[in-house]
């Protein structure tokens, strides 16, 4: 199937994702599904293949690919908000292995403390009901992360960002362990 849900509205797309997955499981058949929509890939697939410029970059379960991407290209394909790709020395925390050029920091890799030892500033907050997207500036770099909607924070607030078990990549964009 080649992007069968791409022209549908969000509500119908969500309903049909569940229905297609149910039918596929019920029939016990293999379904090859092509999509650029990471939500469709993550919610419908038992296994995902990430392709770039005609090359298969990585194959695995959605959880494996999200948590252990082979390279920067793969890391940037999954996750909402998108992974923050930062210089290795921008934020404290973590233990970058030798050769680290880029740190990949997803929401779960960032600890936020308001006001204490500030190294970043909140530029904008998107209130989404059950969560907030924080748009943050650390030096000349912009980051986006999720935050509890009840976190007492406002645009202009200075915050401390610390890394917690982020992903590390070398100069060629390959994942380091």
Q: Predicted segment positions?
A:
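C-terminal boundary and immediately downstream tail of ABC-type ATPase nucleotide-binding domains
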Residues: 67-93, 104, 162
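Secondary-structure boundary/capping residues
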Residues: 29-32, 83, 131
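Short glycine-rich loop/turn motifs that provide flexible caps or phosphate-binding loops at active sites
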Residues: 48, 59, 78, 87, ...
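ABC ATPase nucleotide-binding domains
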Residues: 1-73
């Amino acid at each position: 199937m080649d992007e069968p849900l791409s022209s549908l509205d969000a509500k119908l797309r969500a309903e049909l994702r569940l229905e297609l997955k149910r039918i596929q499981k019920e029939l016990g058949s293999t379904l090859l599904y092509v999509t650029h929509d990471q939500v469709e890939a993550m919610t419908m697939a038992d296994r995902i293949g990430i392709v770039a410029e005609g090359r298969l970059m990585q194959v695995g379960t959605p959880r494996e690919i999200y948590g252990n991407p082979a390279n920067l290209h793969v890391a940037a394909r999954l996750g909402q908000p998108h992974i923050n790709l930062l210089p290795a020395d921008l934020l404290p925390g973590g233990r970058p292995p030798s050769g680290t050029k880029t740190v990949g920091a997803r929401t779960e890799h960032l600890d936020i403390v308001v006001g204490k030892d500030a190294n970043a500033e909140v530029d904008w907050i998107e209130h989404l009901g059950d969560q907030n997207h924080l748009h943050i500036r650390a030096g000349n770099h912009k980051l986006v992360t999720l935050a509890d909607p009840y976190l007492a924070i406002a645009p202009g607030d200075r915050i401390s960002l610390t890394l917690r078990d982020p992903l590390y990549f070398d100069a060629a964009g390959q994942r380091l362990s």
